[in-house]
């Protein structure tokens, strides 16, 4: 029987839809340029004191699932924190965020997938982060937790951990460097995999042992930050990949909420070169640990520039630091409040009024002319 034009078109469309549904898309291992990777190194104090609290109130009010995940993690954190050695400046909000994330990632919950998908794409542009990333406070707390819990590289690097990914691909070229592009759980036990899975053998400098946050007494589970840079190689003749940390993180964003624009290259983040005290309120003995990161070699990273850490943040009404490279996207205007744009997690009170600044400038000019 001859098929009519309409039936043929319908059949082809149905076939295309089915192919799209059942097709397994390969995950590309690269520098993850679209991931939101702000480390807040120049503005962490200003962000936490002036902006993060309001973001938290608004984001928690707008997301019942986030609120439930946070409340459950807070109960677990309160029960565990007395058993942990923690830096003196490690805050409860950091511990709750870390507890929440590792629990959700371990269980592969809907919150984990929603948050991870949002992080992977929020770095497309600063505008995307400002208007379409409803996890600004949670991301900040999680980043700060990993920063403060990092160990010296010689301690974390010697532990090999493994992660699996379905049909991940990597294109070998001149540099062969990559970032995982998300907050990734890895395990000390090599997993059994199916035929369509690759094993990533990882040696990390910035991964944090989070077993105790999962009620485990060992360091068998490690959480790796999305900004850590790895040298990638192939393991023998297999398709499995070996990721060896170059002892550096890099970011395309720095203080994005305060005006920092996306850079053309991934900028290496300088680490703090100061000791930190690990503190447990139930124990008198303090353990002093050196950060162990005083040798960042920019020559090993020809495409990565080094950003010096300093506590001299951008003011909201200042222009972004152009030394981080030419921005790919223009700075968006004022961030609208939740009433006018529900996906923006910060209200008008967070950023100064352009009109007010203009009036001040005009008034100053008039006074100058009169003088």
Swiss-Prot record:
One of its GO terms (molecular function) is nucleotidyltransferase activity. Keywords: Cell membrane, Disulfide bond, Glycoprotein, Glycosyltransferase, GPI-anchor, Lipoprotein, Membrane, NAD, NADP, Nucleotidyltransferase, Signal, Transferase. Pfam families: ART. The keyword DNA-binding does not apply. Disulfide bonds join 43-255. Belongs to the Arg-specific ADP-ribosyltransferase family. This is Ecto-ADP-ribosyltransferase 3. It comes from Mus musculus.
């Amino acid at each position: 029987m001859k098929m009519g034009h309409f039936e043929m078109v319908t059949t082809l469309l149905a076939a295309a839809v089915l192919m799209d549904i059942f097709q397994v898309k390969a995950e590309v291992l690269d520098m993850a340029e679209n991931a939101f990777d702000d480390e807040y190194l120049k503005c962490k104090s200003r962000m936490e004191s002036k902006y993060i609290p309001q973001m938290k109130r608004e984001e928690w009010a707008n997301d019942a699932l986030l609120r439930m995940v946070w409340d459950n993690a807070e109960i677990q954190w309160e029960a565990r924190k007395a058993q942990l050695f923690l830096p003196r400046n490690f805050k409860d909000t950091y511990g709750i965020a870390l507890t929440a994330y590792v629990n959700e990632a371990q269980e592969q919950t809907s919150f984990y997938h929603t948050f991870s998908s949002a992080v992977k794409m929020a770095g497309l542009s600063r505008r995307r982060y400002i208007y379409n990333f409803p996890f600004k406070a949670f991301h900040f707390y999680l980043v700060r937790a990993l920063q403060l819990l990092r160990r010296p590289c010689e301690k974390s690097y010697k532990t090999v951990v493994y992660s699996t990914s379905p049909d991940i691909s990597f294109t070998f070229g001149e540099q062969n460097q990559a970032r995982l592009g998300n907050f990734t759980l890895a395990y000390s036990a090599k997993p059994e995999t199916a035929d369509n899975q690759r094993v990533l053998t990882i040696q990390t400098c910035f991964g944090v042992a989070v077993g105790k946050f999962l009620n485990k007494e060992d360091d068998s589970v490690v959480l790796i930050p999305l900004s850590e840079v790895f040298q990638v190689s192939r393991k023998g003749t297999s398709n499995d990949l070996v990721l060896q940390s170059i002892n550096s993180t890099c970011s395309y964003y720095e203080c994005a909420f305060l005006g920092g624009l996306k850079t053309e290259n991934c900028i290496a983040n300088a680490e703090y070169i100061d000791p930190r005290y690990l503190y447990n309120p139930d124990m008198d003995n303090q353990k002093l640990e050196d950060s162990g990161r005083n040798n960042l070699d920019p020559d090993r990273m020809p495409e990565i520039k080094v950003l010096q850490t300093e506590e001299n943040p951008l003011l909201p009404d200042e222009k972004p630091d152009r030394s981080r490279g030419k921005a790919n996207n223009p700075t968006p205007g004022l961030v609208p409040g939740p009433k006018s744009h529900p996906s923006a997690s910060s209200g008008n009170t967070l950023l100064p009024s352009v009109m007010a600044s203009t009036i001040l400038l005009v008034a100053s000019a008039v006074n100058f002319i009169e003088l």
